[in-house]
UniProtKB/Swiss-Prot annotation:
Organism encoding this protein: Mus musculus
Name the record gives this protein: Cadherin-22
Name of the encoding gene: Cdh22
Induction of its expression: Down-regulated by thyroid hormone.
GO biological process, one term: calcium-dependent cell-cell adhesion via plasma membrane cell adhesion molecules
Pfam family of the protein (one): Cadherin
Glycosylated residue positions: N159, N463, N609
Chain ranges of the Cadherin domain: 61-165, 166-274, 275-391, 392-495, 496-613
Length: 813
């Protein structure tokens, strides 16, 4: 089979020169293929050679590729090519068929001639080629005359697709003041046309808008800066339009464009600047340290960390600028001027300082642009306030002898009004600091004097608060703390440290140490204590004992002879005179008690006659703690036992069944109904009945104990006659005394008195009043049936009153 190349020109007569040229290319290929023997590799389908005649020579397809132009817009099917078998003699006995991609739909074949036509518009960008198979069969027997051959129909590309930017939107950035040629970003477009055929997919990039500031590489699409002076403060964002054109930019090529957003990033190329060169503030002189005077902010055209700045204060000579300091607000980048020393309007009324602002981060590349700092003058005016008087000094120490007379001068405090008016000052002592009013102060001069006698041994120091206030405005008040030390004078005699008692054996030897004596003195002389010991002048030569002054503020008592006889004298009292060093010299006499005791051979005391001798001993802290712990344990045990007993009693009482007995109360006066029972503890009253039963008596009026009988017998012993003008109170006294004695002897009476006073007729009781004065007079008001609704306890009462009512109404009926 061989093609008919001349058929390829059938549909091209009316084509444009370009399309005609494209169609001629495959025709030239057809001519070349027709003159060249077909290789065996172009004849797939040799597996069907067994269908051919055994003596037939194998033939091969001489054409296996066709071309068809895409985007054909004609009304007639587009001729693709012709397949032809060498065995075709033109008599119509051979039938040509095709199969494969698009066979029968896109591509149709004439069974007689083998002409192939494309019936649909093809798009190479969707599918570039179609693979089909051709068969030549005997029309009568449908037998393959030649092996099936595979061929390809390629869609011939035309420039019908414009370039597209597929990765937009494009956003790039570049630092301001970047040098010319600085790379910003790269953009790339794609073309769906065949890059291997012609120039349909060869793209060229160009800048349509923004060429004054940026350029683009025609081949790579890299965007670069075109100028070195991009300034973010002037323009922060640029919209650059980039165009991609195919056909290598030649005339007739298709193009596509995209917009690239280029953001100019900030660099620190602008120093801080104060909007004005002088700032003025005012503040009261009483403002405490740390008070903010005001805020000042230097402006910076940069953004981000490039605007971070610090502030410094520089004092002008003699302006007192050290009274303020400056801090930086990290959020607002404002300078906060703060008071750091106490201000004084009278000393200085205006403070002038230089405020300097500078960037934290300075880029050395832009150092040639100038210094990145600025200065402004800040003036702070101090306003006057009415200040309280000031003590000079604000605190102090005074001293006074403890034997100073009342009214003696202790010291003088001074305060003055710091204001320019210099108003007079009055003084006083805060009595909360001197509750006993030991000191007084002169209101005009501030002289402090003693108001009472002093005693260093009672209070060696006094802390008082002195008040100073303006004479015409007591609200302006200040305070000063004074410490007054009471100086000691020798006004307390020395005394023996303890009431000394010593014991000596009957067989004591001469010179034996009995007791070492020490002394205490409440005074505290500046040179220290020095005490002297000696026996009293009345007994300077004691035959039994001697006293030795050791000269270290102690003395030793020794025996004078051998042995003592406790039958003759078992106790000796040794008076000792103790003298201090003054001045003035004071003395006192103490007594050492010496007991004569019987001792064993080792000198251990056995007995001291019938007089108990207590050895002087001191308990250690551990022994004291142990003793206290024992006492606490005993107290806790006692409380625990008491609590258990009470709990046991309450438990027993709770187990007793509730007393369901009714209470019948007899009234001889116009009482208050059920409210009379509210003041009684019914369980206590009923205990009388229980106690009487236990004793075998009859609380209801039977035999009773003698105290109860006496009480009952005297129940009506009060005289009932008219009272005399001058009553005999002894009768009442005797009566009450007997009642008290009976109550004390009777164990069954309640442990408290019950005294009732009735000032109403019981209207508040749920049962209303039982008094005849408050009873109803109508028949409806005498209906007692409602008592049955009160429960079983009141049913007998309801029946009783119901029967009484029937008796009263019978005669009437």
């Amino acid at each position: 089979m061989r093609p008919r190349p001349e058929g390829a020109l059938r549909a091209g007569a009316a084509l444009s020169p370009v399309l005609l040229f494209l169609l001629l290319l495959p025709l030239l290929g057809h001519l070349w293929a027709a003159s060249t023997p077909a290789p065996s590799s172009l004849s797939p389908g040799a597996q069907e050679d067994n269908q051919l005649g055994a003596g037939r020579v194998k033939r091969g397809w001489v054409w296996n590729q066709f071309f068809v132009v895409e985007e054909y817009t004609g009304t007639e099917p587009l001729y693709v090519g012709k397949i032809h078998s060498d065995s075709d003699e033109g008599d119509g006995t051979i039938k040509y068929t095709i199969s494969g991609e698009g066979a029968g739909t896109i591509f149709l074949i004439d069974e007689l001639t083998g002409d192939i036509h494309a019936t649909e518009r093809l798009d190479r960008e969707q599918k570039t080629f179609y693979t089909l198979r051709a068969q030549a069969r005997d029309r009568a027997t449908n037998r393959l005359l030649e092996p099936e051959s595979e061929f390809i129909i390629k869609v011939q590309d035309i420039n019908d697709s414009e370039p597209r930017f597929l990765h937009g939107p494009y956003i790039g950035s570049v630092a301001e003041l970047s040098p010319t040629g600085t790379s910003v970003m790269q953009v790339m477009a794609s073309d769906a046309d065949d890059p291997t055929y012609g120039s349909s997919a060869r793209l060229v990039y160009s800048v349509l808008d923004g060429e004054h500031h940026f350029t683009v590489d025609p081949k790579t699409g890299v965007i670069r800066t075109a100028v070195p002076d991009l300034d973010r403060e002037s323009q922060e964002r640029y919209e650059v339009v980039i165009q991609a054109t195919d056909m290598a930019g030649q005339l007739g090529g298709l193009s596509g464009s995209t917009t690239v957003t280029i953001v100019v990033t900030d660099v620190n190329d602008n120093p801080p600047r104060f909007p004005q060169k002088m700032y003025q503030f005012s503040i009261q002189e009483s403002a405490p340290i740390g008070t903010a005077v005001g805020r000042v902010k230097a402006e910076d055209s940069d953004v981000g960390e490039n605007t971070d700045m610090t502030y410094h204060l520089r004092e002008e000579s003699g302006s007192g600028g050290d009274a303020f300091k400056v801090t930086t607000d990290s959020d607002t980048q404002e300078a906060i001027i703060v008071v750091q020393k106490h201000l004084d309007f009278e000393s200085q009324q205006v403070h002038t300082v230089v405020l300097e602002a500078l960037n934290k981060f300075v880029d050395p590349r832009f150092a040639d642009l100038g210094t990145f700092r600025d200065q402004a003058i800040v003036r702070v005016a101090v306003t006057d306030v009415d200040e309280p008087p000031e003590f000079r000094p604000p605190s102090g120490l005074l001293e006074v002898q403890e034997d100073a007379q009342v009214g003696s001068l202790v010291g003088v405090v001074t305060a003055r009004d710091p204001d320019a008016a210099n108003r007079p000052v009055r003084y006083a002592i805060d009595r909360d600091s001197d509750l006993e009013q030991i000191f007084d102060i002169d209101a005009d001069t501030g002289a402090i004097v003693t108001g009472k006698g002093l005693d260093r041994e009672t209070a060696g120091w006094h802390n008082i608060t002195v008040l100073a206030m303006e004479a015409d405005n007591h609200a302006q008040l200040s305070r000063a703390s004074l410490r007054i030390r009471i100086l000691d004078v020798n006004d307390n005699p020395p005394e023996l440290a303890t009431p000394y008692e010593a014991a000596v054996c009957e067989d004591a030897k001469p010179g034996q140490l009995i007791q070492t004596i020490s002394v205490v003195d409440r005074d505290e002389p500046q040179g220290g204590h020095r005490f002297y010991f000696r026996l009293v002048p009345e007994a300077p030569s004691n035959p039994h004992f001697s006293l030795l002054d050791i000269e270290d503020n102690t003395a030793a008592v020794h025996t004078q002879h051998v042995g003592f006889n406790r039958q003759e004298q078992d106790v000796f009292l040794l008076p000792i005179l103790v003298v201090d060093s003054g001045p003035p010299t004071l003395s006192s006499t103490g007594t050492l008690t010496i007991r004569i005791c019987g001792c064993d051979s080792s000198g251990t005391i056995q007995s001291c006659n019938t007089t108990a001798f207590v050895m002087a001993a001191s308990l250690s802290p551990g022994a004291l703690i142990a003793l206290l712990v024992c006492v606490l344990i005993l107290v806790v045990l006692a409380l625990l036992i008491l609590t258990l007993r009470r709990h046991h009693k309450s438990h027993l009482s709770s187990d007793v069944d509730e007393d369901m007995r009714d209470n019948v109360i007899k009234y001889n006066d116009e009482g208050g109904g059920e409210q009379d029972t509210e003041a009684y503890d019914m369980s206590a009253l009923r205990s009388l009945y229980d106690f009487g039963e236990l004793k075998g008596g009859d609380p209801g009026g039977g035999a009773a104990s003698p105290p109860q009988a006496a009480s009952s017998s005297e129940r009506h012993s009060l005289p009932r006659g008219p009272s005399s003008p001058e009553p005999d109170f002894s009768v009442f006294r005797d009566f009450i005394s007997r009642k008290v004695a009976l109550a004390d002897a009777d164990l069954s009476v309640p442990p408290y008195d019950a005294f009732q006073t009735y000032a109403f007729e019981g209207a508040g009781s749920p049962a209303a009043s039982l008094s005849s004065l408050h009873s109803g007079s109508t028949g409806s008001e005498q209906d007692f049936a409602f008592l049955r609704a009160w429960g079983p306890r009141f049913r007998p009462l309801a029946a009783l009153y119901a029967g009484h009512r029937g008796d009263d109404e019978a005669p009437a009926s």
